[in-house]
Amino acid sequence: MKLVVLVALWLWPSSLLAYPTITVLPDEEQNLNHYVHILQNLIMSVPTKEQDLGKKLSSSRTVDSAEPRSLASKVLLTPGLVSAQDVTPESDVLIRPVDETTNSRTRGFTLRRRRTQSTAFWSIRPNNISVVLRTEEPFIEKEPEPELESSRLPTEPEPELEPEPEPVAESRQMSEPEEELVTSTTPNKELTGTSRISSMATQPANTQATRITVTVKTTSTMDVSTDSEDVPQLSGQSEIPSAEDLPGRHSLNTRHEDILKKISNINAEIQQGLLGGNNSPEFKEFIKASREHLKRSLALAAAAEHKLEQMYGSNVFPEGRTSDPDNDMEMIINMLYNSRSKLSDYFNIKRVPSELREKASVVNAELRKILCVDQVEMQSLIKKLLSNNMKILNILNVP
């Protein structure tokens, strides 16, 4: 007790200069001392003694995983089974299985990390008021990914449209001669010895995986169950469905192929029909008749065009051109004479088309002026006829 008092008095000035006076309640101080005592016991009970390496088997593996905490979460630590004398400044850790009666399988092995210089993850202030913990993980060492293994990973090609997609296992790379890990799907297969596990977790192309190297050494029997539910990254089949397995993409792919197939069938039928039709007599007769009809049509078109040229070149339409008046009179008289039987129809306004009625009315008016007298002259003529008739009647009625 005296020694504790002397040490406290000796440390009191330095702590007073480093930290100001803090008022602490008795309950808080008791709780803090209790926590510090628990942490000290936990730190003293961490075993770091290196085990004998002569009886262990060596086989190297590297573990690549996007979730490095999953391995540590499945290991049971037993800090109370090793005495404080086994603690060494090295970073080696001994992990032993817990003796419990459970239905699940237990696994025990020694996890050894490479010797690297690192700071402690805890510290205690001089006045024992607070404890500072660091968040460094002492069991995981990150290393850059080597170029040799990165070259082995083929780039994932884009999914192609195929009618019947077949899932391709991406774990074919694990069957190379460099792999020495033996896995089995049976639940109770025992593996003994020291192994360094190496596998590359399947991830999508747009995510960047963190490469983590963990050295694992086993000192006892270990049961490994590689069921697809427990360890999906080692099962050889990715849980992410590919683009070829989607039902919509498959149906669209089959629809496109059906359309292309129908088009090719129609093209083949057309080619066969053309080749077979050239030899049939009906087809030849049809072609011959079509050619003759085309020739007749071209001849009629040429004749009509020639006739129009003659009409425009003749004096039928003398409008805008100077011509001989005697020839024009002869042409018009001949035309009226040739069409004298249809003049009544031509000059009937009711039968004339609407676009020609105005011109027909002008022609009728001019003909009436020429062929008929005016109304005044007509009335005088009628009066003369009436007077003549009266004279004739008077002469006949003479007694």
Curated annotation (Swiss-Prot):
Q: The organism sits in which domain of life?
A: Eukaryota
The biased composition feature labelled Basic and acidic residues covers: 136-145
Name used for this protein in its record: Sperm equatorial segment protein 1
Gene deleted: what happens?
A: Knockout female mice are fertile, while the average number of pups that are fathered by knockout males is significantly lower than that of wild-type fathers.
Q: Which InterPro entries match?
A: Equatorial_segment (IPR026743)
Q: Name one Pfam family in it.
A: SPESP1
Identify the tissues in which this protein is expressed: Testis specific.
Q: Where is the composition biased (Polar residues)?
A: 182-206
The keyword Glycoprotein appears for this protein: yes
Q: Which keywords are on file for this protein?
A: Cytoplasmic vesicle, Developmental protein, Glycoprotein, Signal
List the signal peptide residues.
Answer: 1-18
- Record function comment: Involved in fertilization ability of sperm.
Residues carrying covalently attached carbohydrate according to the record: 128
User: One Gene Ontology cellular component annotation?
Assistant: acrosomal vesicle
Q: Which gene encodes it?
A: Spesp1
Q: Which organism is it from?
A: Mus musculus
Q: Where is the composition biased (Low complexity)?
A: 207-225
Q: Would you kindly state one Gene Ontology biological process term found in this protein's UniProt entry?
A: fusion of sperm to egg plasma membrane involved in single fertilization
Q: What is its main location?
A: cytoplasm
Has the keyword Glycoprotein been applied to this entry?
Answer: yes
Post-translational modifications: Glycosylated. In testis there are two predominant forms of 77- and 67-kDa and a form of 47-kDa, whereas in epididymal sperm from caput, corpus, and cauda there are two forms of 47- and 43-kDa. Testis forms contain complex carbohydrate residues. Epididymal sperm forms are N-glycosylated. Then undergoes significant glycosylation in the testis and that the majority of these glycoconjugates are removed by the time sperm reach the caput epididymis.
Location in the cell reads: Cytoplasmic vesicle, Secretory vesicle, Acrosome
User: Per its UniProt record, what PANTHER family does this chain match?
Assistant: SPERM EQUATORIAL SEGMENT PROTEIN 1
